[in-house]
Curated annotation (Swiss-Prot):
A Pfam entry, by short name: tRNA-synt_1_2
Name of the molecule in the record: Leucine--tRNA ligase
EC number(s) reported in the record: 6.1.1.4
Location within or outside the cell: Cytoplasm
UniProt enzyme class: ligase
Entry-linked Gene3D superfamilies: 2.20.28.290, 3.10.20.590, HUPs, Isoleucyl-tRNA Synthetase, Domain 1
Gene name for this UniProt entry: leuS
InterPro entries for this protein: aa-tRNA-synth_I_CS, aa-tRNA-synth_Ia, Leu-tRNA-ligase, Leu_tRNA-synth_edit, M/V/L/I-tRNA-synth_anticd-bd, Methionyl/Leucyl_tRNA_Synth, Rossmann-like_a/b/a_fold, tRNAsynth_Ia_anticodon-bd
Similarity comment: Belongs to the class-I aminoacyl-tRNA synthetase family.
Positions with a binding annotation for ATP: 628
Biological process annotations from GO: leucyl-tRNA aminoacylation
Keywords: Aminoacyl-tRNA synthetase, ATP-binding, Cytoplasm, Ligase, Nucleotide-binding, Protein biosynthesis
């Protein structure tokens, strides 16, 4: 064993061993309990960032720990290769996106290997491989045949920068989730998958996800947005349009309905607009507002409306109800009806609209204590007791709902339904770099799937030029024009939303080389569901929703048996770093890398002045999420080259709880490296002392028992921290404390001392292995074990060692440690004082001093204060 710790040397050796022996490659073994650990699929953007490192280190710690428990552990890796960044890079460099993608994959693969992650590289997937996406195309056709796929022309979110459709989930604050460009709205034909048919299953399934974060489940519940309401048919007076179906959220307010409101896209609106120029103009102004409302972008817009000159009839009171078109009603809500019955006395939106256009307001609910509502300044929205409601007077809101519902059903004009905020998944994208949609258009206009025997429909290789940056597939005549049964047909030139590829990749990992189907059922059912999934909470209503949906689709066509894709989900927190900028002459913020900034701090450590490498006075913007936009990212390669992979892994897992934000401090990696060096040095000194004798359990002294107690208590704590609590930072803190305690307590005087130390060091190395596998591999070997640490089991606590009869007390004089004493575990304060006094009075320096105060911290320290 070398005297000094050189992390890069040992990491290369250990990684080569893992690579040569394919240590972490696995197959199905029904005699072993499986454990499938997976971190979310990375996009090959060119470089790993620290967010990647955190995600994958968490997964690797869990995987290695579970492997030491004797489980058959699958931890695969692959690449989410399609998407806009590759296409944008190809446009800039005038080349094919695959060149950029594969170059990035090679570099990022080297980065992952340099961190020592225990991946089964034989299962590596790349989603732009035709042998991967052929099964995605096949699956889409199966769903089409089952009636779960349809095509319709619809108003969509459109990103003018990327020239493509965005799903509702991909619109953030009115802008594209990638480039933040303000979205526009277009009507174009789109392919949809009926995720709404699975709304109940997606909602109810959340109750079975016991080990998912509540925040994620709440976000999904809200996105699915289940509510119960009633559709009621109203007759229309004096019109060739005879009826209208409207949505009513609260039937207890039914007797107070004073007008009806419909969306700008409602069929009645569009029909009347043909003969009403004012309404047609209103539609031209507001025809995108309702979809903005659906996307939660319409908060600050003023409510606008226009009267249709039509009246409906209240089916119970027979009151005439004016029908208005309003800009705040979405056609996508209320089961697609886009029409509501408005009771302004008891709904704030309706109240505001009624006041603006001087519409009738009829209160019909009073407070539960009988007080009449004051609706002068706002609506009264609480449930209560009905009045002003004919036969329903004096009923509570809850009771009235049932009575009014029965009345309307008896009249055969109402149907109570469950409604969802969730909309069908639009999967068409007007981009080149994606999976071709396997549909063709015949000469007679019929659209149908490509024959399954002709799959995959392979994306052609196209080089970008100035003339073909948009709709590049549609301009490729040789690809778009093909034949079917000896007739000319045209291919669909849209590609799939890239969330399609990432919705089923986890299942393909179970059988990546299977050529006869989408999944090999025995392998898929052996490994699935995933035991531990890891990724950011920002995916809660996009990837994690589609991921669950796809799993149920695959189950329902018989590919898999389980109901949910992952048993346990861990959402790691963001990584924050210092951020600096200066204002340029044109008033723009120029963000400066923290590596190029020199800062002056006050006594409290706060930054008071900063200058960059060019001499600019820069402004400290605080701790912000690491990002390219703020130029505050840290290159993992630079940290690995400077400190070694184990130190980086240690810091990432130690600096903060896994689910919390982590504040990046390079000094933290320096501290991790110092600890690993200390561990190396102590182990080196121990080994240099020669042969280790087997521990004699019958000749244990008090100090031995204390050390063994601490060691085996630490095993219990670290096991619980990693396994049940997933509190990895406290696990590492416990290991460090144990190491420090050993050094404090334990002078080495004889072979029994060395045997106890050997046991302690061996267990520390085992406990550290999931976190710092390279140094652990070498130290385990140097401690004399013939099997590699990769093949060892997790340490089991010796319960007898924990049940010690004595405890260690540190004796201090004026706060400085002088002695260690062992006292019976149940000793009272006076007994401990006497034993401690006898120990310290052996110190000649105390003879002329007077002890005037004794401070005792139970079971830890006794401190004698002298004059």
């Amino acid at each position: 064993m070398k005297k000094l710790y050189f992390p890069h040397q040992i990491e290369r050796i250990v990684q080569q061993h893992w690579n040569d022996n394919q240590t972490f490659s696995v197959t199905e073994d029904k005699n072993k309990q499986k454990f499938y650990c997976l971190s979310m699929l990375p996009y090959p953007s060119g470089n790993l960032h620290m967010g990647h490192v955190r995600n994958y280190t968490i997964g690797d710690v869990i995987s290695r720990y579970q492997r030491m428990l004797g489980k058959n552990v699958l931890q695969p890796i692959g690449w989410d290769a399609f998407g806009l960044p590759a296409e944008q890079a190809a446009i800039i460099h005038k080349k094919n996106p695959s060149d950029w993608t594969y170059s990035n994959i090679q570099y990022m693969k080297q980065q992952l290997k340099s961190l020592g992650f225990a991946y089964d590289w034989k299962r590596e997937l790349i989603t732009n491989d035709p042998q991967y996406y052929r099964w995605e195309q096949w699956f889409f056709i199966i769903l089409y045949e089952k009636g779960l796929v349809y095509r319709k022309t619809t108003l969509v979110n459109w990103c003018p920068y990327h020239n493509t459709v965005l799903a509702n989930e991909q619109v953030i604050n009115g802008g594209c989730w990638r480039c933040h460009t303000k979205i526009q709205y277009k009507k174009i034909p789109q392919w949809f998958i009926k995720i709404t048919h699975y709304a109940d299953q997606l909602l109810n399934g959340l109750n079975q996800l016991q080990y998912w974060p509540e925040q994620v489940k709440t976000m999904q519940r809200n996105w699915i947005g289940q509510s119960t309401g009633t559709n009621v048919i109203f007759k229309i007076l004096n019109s060739n349009i005879t009826t209208i179906t409207v949505y009513i959220a609260r039937l207890d307010t039914f007797m107070g309905i004073s007008y009806l409101t419909i969306s700008v896209d409602h069929p009645i609106t569009l029909q009347i607009a043909k003969i009403n120029p004012d309404l047609a103009n209103f539609i031209s102004i507001y025809n995108t507002i309702s979809i903005q409302l659906h996307n939660k972008q319409f908060i600050c817009h003023k409510k606008k409306g226009i009267f249709t000159n039509l009246y409906a009839v209240h089916p119970i009171t027979f009151t005439k109800l004016p029908i208005w078109v309003a800009n705040f009603i979405t056609p996508l809500e209320f089961d697609g009806q886009g029409a509501i019955a408005s009771c302004p006395a008891h709904d704030q939106h309706d109240w505001e609209f009624a006041h603006q256009y001087d519409l009738p307001i009829k209160p019909v609910i009073k407070y539960a204590d009988g007080e009449l509502p004051n609706i002068t300044n706002q609506a009264m929205i609480e449930p209560g007791i009905l009045f002003n409601s004919d036969n329903f007077d004096d009923l509570t809101s809850h009771t009235a709902i049932n009575y009014i519902s029965k009345k309307l059903i008896d009249l055969k004009i109402a149907k109570t339904k469950i409604f969802y905020h969730l909309q069908d998944w639009g999967v068409s994208r007007q981009r080149y770099w994606g999976v071709p949609i396997p549909m063709i258009k015949l000469k007679n206009g019929i659209i149908q799937p490509v024959p399954k025997s002709e799959l995959p429909v392979i994306l052609p290789e196209i080089i970008y030029t100035k003339n073909n940056e948009n709709n590049i597939l549609s301009k490729n005549f040789n690809w778009t024009h093909t034949t079917y049964k000896n007739q000319d047909v045209i291919r669909d030139t849209d590609t799939f939303d890239t969330f399609m590829e990432s919705s089923w990749y986890y299942a393909r990992y179970t059988c990546p080389h299977y050529h006869d189907g989408m999944l090999q059922s025995d392998a898929a059912n052996y490994w699935l569901p995933i035991d531990q999934y890891i990724g950011g909470i920002e995916h809660a209503t996009m990837h994690l929703m589609y991921f669950r949906f796809y799993h149920k689709l695959m189950r329902d066509i018989g590919l898999i048996q389980s109901n949910e894709p992952a048993i346990r989900l861990l959402c790691q927190g963001m990584i924050l770093a210092d951020s600096f900028y200066y204002i340029s002459n044109d008033g723009q913020k120029n963000w400066v890398s923290p590596n190029k900034v020199i800062s002056t701090r006050d006594k409290m450590g706060h930054i008071i002045k900063s200058i960059d490498a060019d001499g600019n006075n820069v402004i400290y913007a605080g701790l912000c999420k690491m990002s390219k936009s703020k130029n505050n990212g840290i290159d993992p390669n630079a940290m690995i080259q400077k400190y070694g992979a184990d130190a980086v892994r240690f810091f990432i897992m130690f600096a903060a709880p896994a689910h919390s934000t982590l504040e990046w401090k390079e000094s933290g990696i320096e501290g991790a490296l110092r600890f690993l060096k200390r561990l190396w040095n102590i182990t080196y000194q121990h080994i240099q002392n020669g042969l280790i004798h087997q521990l004699n359990m019958y000749k244990l002294e008090n100090k031995h028992k204390i050390i063994r107690q601490k060691v085996h208590e630490t095993i219990i704590k670290v096991t619980d921290d990693i396994d049940r609590r997933q509190s990895f930072n406290t696990a590492l803190a416990a290991i460090m404390k144990l190491f420090n305690d050993i050094q404090d307590i334990f002078p080495i005087n004889n072979t029994q001392d060395r045997s106890v130390l050997h046991e302690a060091l061996s267990i520390i190395v085992k406990l550290l292995y999931p976190f710092t596998p390279h140094i652990s591999y070498i130290l385990w070997k140097e401690l004399g074990y013939t099997n590699t640490i990769d093949d060892t089991t997790w340490p089991t606590p010796d319960l007898q060692a924990i049940q010690t009869q004595e405890i260690l007390i540190i004796v201090q004089i004026n706060g400085k440690k002088k002695k260690k004493i062992f006292v019976p575990i149940n000793s009272d304060k006076n007994t401990i004082h006497e034993i401690a006094k006898q120990a310290i009075y052996q110190d000649k320096n105390l003879e002329s001093k007077y002890v005037h105060k004794i401070i005792y911290i139970p079971n830890k320290i006794i401190n004698f204060i002298t004059k």
